[in-house]
Amino acid sequence: MQVIFDDNGLHKSLAPFTLTRPVAEIRFGIMTIRESWAYYFDLHGVDYETAYLTKDYLNAKFKKGNLEDDSLNIAGNYKATPSLVKEVLALKKGEGLFVNGVRLAQKGQTVETEINTTAEDLLSIEKSWHIFQRNDKAVESDFEILTSNKTSQVLSETNRSNNPENIFIAEGAKVEHAILNASTGPIYIGKD
């Protein structure tokens, strides 16, 4: 199945970030929007190929998608959440998932049936400043994904920290002589 991330007409309003990449390739939280979808698709065993509906000049680097009967078109400005992914994967050909009149996803070339989402944990960006205003929620969402069923490395004694339960150090990552302040949100340190 081809999964197509659509800029949803937001290319200009998310500039300058979208001048060199499609909307779904914006880092929103720890991961890009596309990476958050990839995590859940892999978790559900979905066999897919990624493509984009974006500005033509970006197609040299980012594969252009073609809407077909079995393709899944996803608004590239919405980060994947468990409830949203469940609704998107349940779409049948000709169905579209909407929130407040805005299309979140559609299965196939056209939308014949509109379904309103029941997902309450939606994370989206429509303007460039939303990346910063809503980043805390996106980081928390990604932190849960990246640390689920995993054990953090022990922080060495050369470091100082507070709220160690909000600090995760991935295997292979090194942190020395640092002050880690996790009092207002989680800290994820990936492998070097």
Descriptions of predicted regions:
Residues Q153, N159, I167-I179, I187, ...:
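A structural motif detector for beta-strand N-caps
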Residues M1-P164:
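Terminal amphipathic alpha-helical/low-complexity segments used for targeting or macromolecular assembly
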Residues S183:
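Hydrophobic, aromatic-lined core segments that form the binding pocket/scaffold
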